[in-house]
């Protein structure tokens, strides 16, 4: 139980240095499961349903801005109580990780920010609003739901679609499947994503790496380059064969990025500001 939020639902796997994984908007902790399974031999992986998402309740403070989400992550990192925690965030989760790292460097060892940067185009946020607030809100059965998710996320492998269907929806009284993510919370969250992230990235004092999917239409190459120019000291990775949903589409590459980054925390990397691509 955190001071500002409802009780956070979490899944955990493995033993070792702690990693706290933060999902994107409308998603849930289970999108991280393949990455967690790849890292569990060396790390204590914790993934949460963030406020208003999944099986986590609505926050008592009713807030869905960057600071509120970041406080949850930072407070949970401190609660884990095994020294500073590395945050691994995707999309909304990456934004929250950057803000938390800037807010609480005492609790955060480092930040892996996947598919969220400053300078994202307004058109990308408008398209996100349409996807999140539009579309059907209930489904007659699992087949209908799976078909919809496969259409909405064409790049996701079948196992990722199945996890989203199984862990992001529940049956209501009439038997129809509805999202666990609260509709009002999602609208407020999408509005909050438009906050200017540049000041937080500029003052982020803990080690970090910026990650983009090579085919992403959310974080454009121009936006990513601008973020890298803002912080030329930070390493950057472009993951080939992935669009926005890098952790679900390329879990092996994400696990490799996490291992390399965590190794750099233990032993400083030789070349800051290095930008590389994976195939």
Label the predicted regions:
Residues 1-19, 40-43, 81-84, 232, ...:
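Alpha/beta-hydrolase fold catalytic core
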Residues 6, 11-13, 37-40, 46-88, ...:
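Active-site loop/oxyanion-hole signature of alpha/beta-hydrolase fold enzymes
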Residues 16, 24-27, 91:
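Active-site glycine-rich loops that stabilize anionic/oxyanionic intermediates
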Residues 24-34, 45:
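Serine-hydrolase catalytic-loop signature spanning alpha/beta hydrolases and amidase-signature enzymes
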Residues 83-122:
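Conserved hydrolase catalytic core segment
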Residues 120-181:
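Helix-rich cap/lid subdomain of alpha/beta-hydrolase
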Residues 172-230, 235-238:
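Conserved serine/cysteine hydrolase catalytic core
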Residues 242-251, 255:
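Catalytic histidine-centered segment of alpha/beta-hydrolase-like enzymes
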